[in-house]
Amino acid sequence: MPLFELFRLTKAKLESAQDRNPSPPVDEVVELVWENGQISTQSQSSRSRNIPPPQANSSRAREIGNGSKTTMVDEIPMSVPSLMTGLSQDDDFVPWLNHHPSLDGYCSDFLRDVSSPVTVNEQESDMAVNQTAFPLFQRRKDGNESAPAASSSQYNGFQSHSLYGSDRARDLPSQQTNPDRFTQTQEPLITSNKPSLVNFSHFLRPATFAKTTNNNLHDTKEKSPQSPPNVFQTRVLGAKDSEDKVLNESVASATPKDNQKACLISEDSCRKDQESEKAVVCSSVGSGNSLDGPSESPSLSLKRKHSNIQDIDCHSEDVEEESGDGRKEAGPSRTGLGSKRSRSAEVHNLSERRRRDRINEKMRALQELIPNCNKVDKASMLDEAIEYLKSLQLQVQIMSMASGYYLPPAVMFPPGMGHYPAAAAAMAMGMGMPYAMGLPDLSRGGSSVNHGPQFQVSGMQQQPVAMGIPRVSGGGIFAGSSTIGNGSTRDLSGSKDQTTTNNNSNLKPIKRKQGSSDQFCGSS
């Protein structure tokens, strides 16, 4: 079957379906006339008519709203020239150039979010060219039915198809009478498909919190009253039902995003006042968002708080010093670090206890050495020990001064005992021995009778030495008294003559023994 025969059959079906709607005759031959920059049609009766309002997306609207075969008829002129159908009606019809229609109308349907808004004058010129290119397939109505707008037809087509059946159509006011409606009905399509706006603090939370927040905001937006936007009244023409139903659809006008955010914030504040009693403890990031309600995921702040408490407890147990009797055992920590800390603390406490025990033992021994010491404090006991040692040193010095002669430690004692003069003096006094141990008696000769015990000293040429306490006389000669075993002393001076005789008889030995004494002192 040729393509024009198929078109003729479909045109007959279309005319039979549209007989109930009054329409002007469309079978008359018309001419295309260019007048004042616009294309118009002129019939045989010389009546000039203006081009109907732009119908860029009439085919898309009929496909969505009606669901009938009119879409096939409207799409056939894309590939079939009108000359094939016009030859059967009038042979004198002048063929026209096959002009390809503009694709802006179709791009606005599929790429509505991307395409830029088009002015009304450009749409009228494009639609006029498309309509005059195929004059036999365009149907004009006298105001009862007109092609819906591109944006509103796509926005409302699915609802009309599901509510009123496949044989219903929409009748919206012409876009030419109110050209500002085009820009007002484009923006709601963009904002209606997007999820509701979320506050800035919601972006800082996990995805699960954001999901519940979006759902709650969506419910709140549906329940909250909004300001009355622009209202379009649409008249529905039923093919089977004789009743006319008027459908009021509110299309939200395009408002700035800042105003929408302000509305959402005000709604959130109202909702928060109502649900302040039901607020759940949340983290610092989500504070102030009590409208979210109880979240599905577990609270992160509670876990963090619980772990911090456990760490503080473990640290306090490690630092606390345990007493000897009441000793606490550190609780089992969940981490290996806590167990290591507890072990190190136990070892440290054990070593400290042992050190304190040793110190206590030494202090008890010192307390026993100090007479009449009843102090318990360590500092007090040490003070008592210091005072006692000072008193002992003073007593030793007094006893050494009372003996009458006190020589330096380098002369009195060997080099090994020079550091302990007081102890050596006390030892000599306790044994009944004089200070000048190892020094010869200068007042007597070698044949003189020694009254004390004698012993030989190395380096002294094996001469007997009398142990006596020497005294310094005025003439520089040593004249001392010998010590008797019972501790009594005998004066050797006697009378004056005896003293002179003793001195004369001992002059030579004195010189000889002085040299030996000098030799001992030099060797020492």
Curated annotation (Swiss-Prot):
Changing F209L: In strain: cv. An-2 and cv. Su-0. Transmembrane segments: none annotated. CDD domains: bHLH_AtPIF_like. InterPro entries: bHLH_dom, HLH_DNA-bd_sf, PIF1-like_bHLH, PIF3-like. Its main location: nucleus. Residues 40-49 have a biased composition (Low complexity). This is Transcription factor PIF3. It comes from Arabidopsis thaliana (Mouse-ear cress). The gene is PIF3.
